[in-house]
Amino acid sequence: LVTVSQKNGNLFDRFRDRLMFPIIDVRGNVIGFGGRIMNSSDKSAAKYLNSPETLIFNKRKNLFALNLAKKSKLGYLILVEGYMDAIALHQYGFDCAVASLGTALTEDGANLLSRYTEQVVLIYDGDEAGQNATQRAIPILEKAGLQVKVLKMRDAKDPDEYLKKFGADRFRILLEESANRVEYQLNAILKKYDLRDDEQKVQYLQESAGLIGSLSSAVQREVYG
């Protein structure tokens, strides 16, 4: 918890002004800590900060709250961006939520998920950065053999905010409306173009056709073609 300054060699609190969370592996062992910044006006500081990597703590190979979510009976896991999102989901009864450890989803993380479920619902932040991260996560999850659905946040920036504003029942309805990953990606392509413009319409059709053509399942290609 104490770090040596690279500037002057002094000791300082690595997690000062941060709300701290224990990071627990799937065996129930505390392997590190994560800290969320409390002063949101400090734009220069990272939103989340983890313990330094050690022989027992590798953030690429662990997921926050998986020690709890692996026991869920819901039949799927929810993957979110932040610890607060995962905690809020558990508090509101969605006990299948996990979060990456302050970094983008890795193949190690996806493979870890595949040990406990066959389906993952991605619920990243609704901003551009969150949606870009969603697009990057989809092929990583599919490579691990997981079925992927996507819930795009609306009326709130993230699950934590949505649950506090609207409650569990509204979120449950939203969750049931999650799109499969092909529908999500086709809709994302559609939003890039103005179909009233012939040139943009051609570009939309070309990009959509490219996505559909890349599908490994002949049935999917038939359905979406």
What are these regions (language model features)?
Residues 21, 71, 111, 135, ...:
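A broad, structural surface signal
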Residues 58, 78, 98-102, 126, ...:
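Glycine- and other small-residue-rich loops at beta-strand/loop junctions that grip anionic moieties
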Residues 146-225:
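C-terminal or mid-to-C-terminal helical accessory/interaction module adjacent to the motor/catalytic core
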Residues 12-17, 62, 82, 106, ...:
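Active-site-proximal structural scaffolding
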Residues 103-155, 162-171:
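Conserved catalytic cores of soluble enzyme domains
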Residues 1-116, 120, 133-134:
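Phosphate-handling DNA/RNA-contact segment within nucleic-acid enzymes
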